[in-house]
Amino acid sequence: MKAVMLTGLRQMELRIVPEPKIKKDTDVLLKIERVGVCGSDVHYYETGRIGSQIVEYPYITGHECAATVKAVGKSVTRVKAGDTVAIDPAVSCYTCTQCKLGRENTCYKLRFLGTPGQ
């Protein structure tokens, strides 16, 4: 598959990379159709970092995406192959106090897809 990768400060390349595979029963394999460029992508391009999040090159950019579901793991029930989805790059823990109160966006352990080191 093709991926746009940061290869150094202010350097990008379109590369061919191995296509991911379903590994867990909860995995969903997506074909990315469109990707937005957000502020964090610009920071990674210009400076190679945001605070303690430092890019290790080469690095695939983009985390705000629209995609088509290609395949799903055995236990996935909410989407199926062929569905169109929008990606929320925020990944909540669902176990902390904030998550239990329904405030997943303020999760104490919030992580973001497409972020170095996460």
PLM feature segments, named:
Residues 108:
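P-loop/Walker A NTP-binding region and its immediately flanking N-terminal helices
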Residues 22-35, 49-100, 105, 117:
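Glycine-rich beta-strand-centered segment in the early N-terminal region that forms part
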Residues 40-46:
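Cytochrome P450 core scaffold surrounding the K-helix E-X-X-R motif
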Residues 1-2:
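Extreme N-terminal starter segment of soluble prokaryotic enzymes
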Residues 11-15, 39-40:
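Short N-terminal binding/cap micro-motifs at the start of the first secondary-structure element
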